[in-house]
Structure formats: structure tokens, C-alpha cells
Amino acid sequence: MKKVTAMLFTMAVGLNAVSMAAKAKATEEQETDVLLIGGGIMSATLGTYLQELEPEWSMTMVERLDGVAQESSNGWNNAGTGHSALMELNYTPKKADGSVSIEKAVDINEAFQVSRQFWAHQVQSGVLHEPHSFINTVPHMSFVWGDDNVNFLRARYTALQQSTLFRGMRYSEDHAQIKEWAPLVMEGRDPKQKVAATRTEIGTDVNYGEITRQLVASLQKKPNFALQLNTEVRGFKRNADNSWTVTVADLKNGEAEHAIKAKFVFIGAGGAALKLLQETGIPEAKDYAGFPVGGQFLVSENPDVVNNHLAKVYGQASVGAPPMSVPHIDTRILDGKRVVLFGPFATFSTKFLKNGSLWDLLSSTTTSNFMPMVNVGMDNFDLVKYLISQVMLSDDERFEALKEYYPQAKKEDWRLWQAGQRVQIIKRDEDKGGVLRLGTEVVSDKDGTIAALLGASPGASTAAPIMLHLMEKVFKEKVASPEWQAKLKTIVPSYGTKLNGNIEATEQELQYTSDVLGLKYDKPQVVDEAPKPQLKPQVQPQPAHKAVADIAL
């Protein structure tokens, strides 16, 4: 009996020792210089920059799903537009005197040129390969109808001619000419309808998911880079030396937790970035809240449709709709196949990610951001009405919207696709309590040890300049050093300069990136004469007709 008891005791001690060793291993700390949270294009872009700027730095990327680029960066979850303001009318708002402001359009275009240079450099460095797998020439068009909208497009076209970045843009109000540019848009249209269009040949369709996969695949070839999939962030702890200990769970291994100690943490988790930023406890996070809006598209893969449309055609947002909600009918090249998408139609879910939780919105609401959210809701009732009307749309109503851009569309050629979630930024404001912010914001602590990217637009197309801005903010001294300056100018030749206003530099950059990326580019030859716009000063808006706040879909 004593022998049996002794044996059982020995086994118990042994099992306990094994258990303790397993727990010790589970809580063992992994160390890394840079921790990238989220396997999307932002983390992949930042990681690629840092790998070239500081090749000795160790990096770890964690992603909750079982592969990278499966959320917002996925080609099917976004519109795939290389946003350069060539056709997006919301980037050129009308001023009080009736003229058109182009400042935002110039900024957006400059930013996209940085992305083009970044991608071209990665192709030349062997990081990206087969450019046609991720970027293709697809002309960008604006198309409008009705006297007021035609007059606006005239004014927009005239104003954009003042910028060197928009040289080569064509303009027409002729049905036959526009039909040559976009047959589907014009066939079956009333020949008496007053229409106008602009067209820029150098527009692009971009598969941001493919770019992300290729960037991460290249990073994985480096011995000091680690990718951990099926890994969810569970907590943050700031250490005395200003580093961070981040607790993560292995979702494929019984949610076993382990810790990663990092000198710098980037939260590039799309819609989940806000909640993770809040969990860090940094005071800067208290200024922000988020409101999720989803998007749906009608998709056609019918060759009769696909082969007769090669353009991205953006219209004008209807009265009472946010400017960014502008409908568009787009050629997309996804996984080597051409398709046509029309939309977006706004949807609502409390999830912050397509693969998120229905509790996301509630769990991100805190005592510090609740009132700003209430203030935004009360101050933007027209936006709330718009979202409700979108959610209530029937299939027939969506199809009628499509027929405004494709009069001879057949219902059987189209199916509805749910794209990704876009979390809009709500920021605390001293005067209004809270404001809805269109765009992206880099939020970091004062020491530059942790940073998050919030917001949704223009998003992926400006990943390269956004991550440049982030590095200028958190690695200020490094960016100012001669070593980093030289490398950054190798990656982005125009870094530190403006292309706008310099015809020679603009043409040189477009020619270089087009050659490397396999894109179409012909130097501009002629300027179309457009009828002179009638500038109509805006009547002082009444409170009931306040402009609808903008959101990204």
C-alpha cells in the first residue's frame, strides 16, 4: 500500500512539474523590436519600409484570421480604386462663390504618386512581382447629368487644369464621344438628356490584397521577421523602460496565451484599431469613438457586360447623401479575372470588422466618448436618415439605381456582394462636443512607442504616404538622419518635394512608375475646350438644408 501511495505521489509531483513547465512556457516572453498588429496593407507597408530602413530590427506581425489580407485589404471588400481625385467629385467641393476648390484633390493625387513610387521601388527590389497581378490601367471617369451637375463638372474641369497633376484629362458633353469612352453608360440613354464626362487614361484599378500578400511573403524571407496567424491580442502593459508587453492568444491552440515584448507597437487592425487603442490606456485614445458603416456592391461577371466596360465611372452624390457615397460602376481585375461592380450601398452592423463581433460598437463606447457620439448623432440627423433609407433599400430599388448608370442593365446579370466594414472616426471637439472626421488619423502616445491608424478614407491607396507620416511622427530623429533621408529618397524619389507645379518632375515620375508597373502613360498633348461654367454663388444655406456630413463606404 505504501508503495502504491509513494508511486501516486511521485506521479502527482511529476505531472505538476510538467504542468508548471508548460505554464512557464506559455507565459514565456517573446521579444521583438517592432510588433505589427493586423495583417493588412498598412502593417505590411510599414514593415516593408522598416525592413529597408533598419534591416537589423526584428519584427513580429500578428493576425487574428488564418491568413493576411482577409479583411478590409481583401480585393472583394473594397472598391479597388487607386484614389487620385481624377474622378471623385467629393474631393473638389463647390466654394461659396460658385467656383471649385481643388486643394484636397491635389493632396490626394500627390499622395497616390507616393504610393506608385513605393510600389515601383518594391518591384525593382524584387519584393513585389508581376505588377499586373495587383495594378492595372483602368481609365477614371466622372459622369453627370442635369444642368447644375454639368455646370459643376465644367467648373471642376476648368479648375483642375491649373494643376500639373491633372494634365491629360479629357472633357466632353457629346453623347457619341462619351459612348466611345463608356458604352454601357450611354446605350439606351435619352439622347436629349444633358450629360457631361471627364476621362483620364492613367487611372488605375488596384488589388490591395495581392499587394499585401506579396509584401508579407517577402518579409517572411527575412530571418528576423515572424508572422503569427490565428493570434488575437488580449491585453497591453506598459513597462518601466517604455516598451510594451502585449498578451496574445493562439486561437488554434486552445487560446493559449503568451506575451510579446516590443519596443514599438503599431496597431494597423482596420476597424479593430480603435478598441485595441483604447485597451492600451494611453490618454490620447480618449478623444476618439467609432461608428461602423458597411458597404454592398452589385457584381456582374457576364462577359457581355464585362467586355463592354473598361472604366471606373463615378457620378455625383444625390441630394441628402454624403458626398463620399457617390455611386460608381467599375471595372475590377480580381485574381486575374475582370468583373464589373456597382455601388456602394450603405449597410449597418454593430461589427467593426466583417469578421468582428456584434458587441464591437457597445464595447468601444466609454464614459469619455459617449457624449461626442451623441452629439454627432444629434448634429447629423440627415446622415442618420440617409443610412436608414439605405438599409431599407429593396433589390428593385438597388437595381433602379444601377440603371441610372447602365440603362440597359438586366437583373439576372447581377448579384449582391457584402463588402467590408468602415469605422468612421468621431473625435471630441471643444465647440461641438464631437465631430465626424473623414479620412485617416495616426494616433500615438507622446513618446512614440505605440501608434494606431484610425479611419477609412482614402485608405489603402495612400498606405505608403500614411506610413511615411507615421514614421515622421514616431521615429522623428531617425527620419531626420542622413541615412534614413537617403534611403527614403531611394524608395520614394519625390520624397520631400511637391510634384504639383512642376511639369517636368510630374511627367518624369508618371513615366518611371508606368514603365515599372506596366501602366499606360502618354504625355498630354491637347486640352479639350469646355463651355465656360456659370459661377453661381451659393445662397446662404438654411439650417434645415445643412450639408450632410461625409462618410467612407
Swiss-Prot record:
Pathway(s) served: Carbohydrate metabolism; tricarboxylic acid cycle; oxaloacetate from (S)-malate (quinone route): step 1/1
Coiled-coil regions, chain positions: none
UniProt superkingdom: Bacteria
Keywords in alphabetical order: FAD, Flavoprotein, Oxidoreductase, Tricarboxylic acid cycle
Biased composition (Low complexity): 534-543
Molecular function, one GO term: 2-hydroxyglutarate dehydrogenase activity
InterPro entries: FAD/NAD-bd_sf (IPR036188), MQO (IPR006231)
UniProt cofactor(s): FAD
GO biological process per UniProt: tricarboxylic acid cycle
Catalytic activity, as annotated: (S)-malate + a quinone = a quinol + oxaloacetate
Region described as Disordered: spans on this chain: 534-553
HAMAP family reported in the protein's UniProt record: MQO
The family this protein is said to belong to: Belongs to the MQO family.
Protein name listed in UniProt: Probable malate:quinone oxidoreductase
Organism encoding this protein: Citrobacter koseri (strain ATCC BAA-895 / CDC 4225-83 / SGSC4696)
Name of the coding gene: mqo
